[in-house]
Amino acid sequence: MVESSSSKTKFAQAHGRYIRGSASKVRRVLDQIRGRTYRDALIMLEFMPYRSTGPITKVLRSAVANAENNMGLDPASLVITRATADMAPSMKRYRPRAQGRAFAIKKQTCHISISVAPSSESTNSEASD
């Protein structure tokens, strides 16, 4: 999805919906890549020891593909401007316990949103040309 704000800065975004994993654990990773360039973020995600880096990488690549295909932007010039993880509905499961009881288990899910935009240095150099 491509949108532009009132200040004429264009950005591309992608969403991952109903991703298995708690929003707080995904936010821990997103806080590390927010504000970084696309290539730096990919390198960081590759070497982080968290399970949530897989879905985050997938959403990040989708956002960059949206910027490249829909807006014609160079992936090397893109910066992650917004990265959020919001709570989604929990999957409810039951674990059988002793004496006919059942304990409820909530399997957390989250929605991941990532926005990328050209870095200010690349837009300044294009404006001066």
Curated annotation (Swiss-Prot):
**Top-level division of the source organism's lineage:** Bacteria
Task: Tell me which Gene Ontology terms the entry assigns under biological process.
Answer: translation
Q: Which Pfam families match?
A: Ribosomal_L22 (PF00237)
Q: Which GO terms describe its molecular function?
A: rRNA binding; structural constituent of ribosome
Give the matching InterPro entries. Ribosomal_uL22 (IPR001063), Ribosomal_uL22_bac/chlpt-type (IPR005727), Ribosomal_uL22_bac/org-type (IPR047867), Ribosomal_uL22_CS (IPR018260), Ribosomal_uL22_sf (IPR036394)
Q: Does the keyword Calcium belong to this entry?
A: no
Q: List the disulfide bonds.
A: none
Tell me which NCBIfam families the record gives: rplV_bact (TIGR01044)
Question: What PANTHER family does its record include?
Answer: CHLOROPLAST 50S RIBOSOMAL PROTEIN L22-RELATED, LARGE RIBOSOMAL SUBUNIT PROTEIN UL22M
Assembly and binders: Part of the 50S ribosomal subunit.
Q: Under which name does UniProt file this protein?
A: Large ribosomal subunit protein uL22
**Species in which this protein is naturally found:** Prochlorococcus marinus (strain MIT 9211)
